């Protein structure tokens, strides 16, 4: 929903892929997934469908965790509506610096908005809880290392380390950036092994 220049799911997010369904049908899909043994209800980039999702979820609780899988650019007001409905938050923290946020996502306020959103997510869930190797509640912050943007990655790592204590949240440092058709400048190449290793060393 940010239309990032490096979006890995452009067909879905920007080309109208999908079909309309009602909140009633969405609830039926949730129920079918649970009956089939799904470990969670994973809602991917659901923010612009918040009203429909909340209607479909009802008052709950569901027998499996409800997962809010998002890009991090969320409003605190919307997140507050999800309290006690969502057990697991999977936000991206794409940027901690304004310059790449503006250049690649047209959202200079992304760092401020995403940090506030993640703090609200953590307020709701508290420290993460694992059960039989599965995340049952909590916040898992993801960060995709971008080519030539190691300083941004370091700033993300710094904020997470300074904001949370060990055991509060999970953090995933991702390396799978793939240049999209028409990518230019820094985004025209993959992340090098040296860049990713440097990010790992900094995180350690």
Q: Whereabouts are the PLM-identified features?
A:
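Canonical Radical SAM [4Fe-4S] cluster-binding loop centered on the CxxxCxxC motif
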Residues: 1-20
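Conserved AdoMet/S-adenosylmethionine-binding subsite of the radical SAM
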Residues: 30-185
């Amino acid at each position: 929903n940010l239309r990032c220049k490096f979006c890995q799911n452009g067909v879905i997010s920007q080309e109208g892929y999908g079909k309309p369904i009602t909140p009633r049908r969405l609830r039926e899909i949730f129920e079918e997934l649970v009956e089939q043994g799904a470990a969670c209800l994973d809602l991917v980039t659901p923010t612009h469908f918040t009203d429909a999702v909340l209607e479909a979820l009802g008052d709950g609780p569901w027998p499996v965790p409800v997962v809010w899988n998002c890009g991090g650019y969320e409003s605190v007001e919307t997140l507050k509506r999800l309290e006690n409905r969502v057990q697991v938050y999977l936000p991206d923290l794409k940027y901690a610096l304004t310059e790449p946020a503006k250049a690649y996502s047209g959202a200079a306020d992304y760092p401020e908005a995403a940090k506030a959103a993640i703090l609200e997510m953590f307020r709701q869930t508290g420290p993460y809880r694992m059960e039989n190797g599965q995340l049952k509640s909590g916040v898992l912050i993801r960060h995709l290392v971008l080519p030539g943007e190691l300083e941004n990655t370091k700033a993300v790592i710094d904020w997470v380390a300074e904001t949370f204590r060990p055991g509060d949240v999970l953090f995933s440092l991702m390396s799978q950036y793939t240049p999209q058709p028409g990518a230019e400048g820094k985004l025209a190449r993959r992340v090098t092994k040296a860049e990713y290793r440097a990010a790992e060393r900094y995180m350690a």
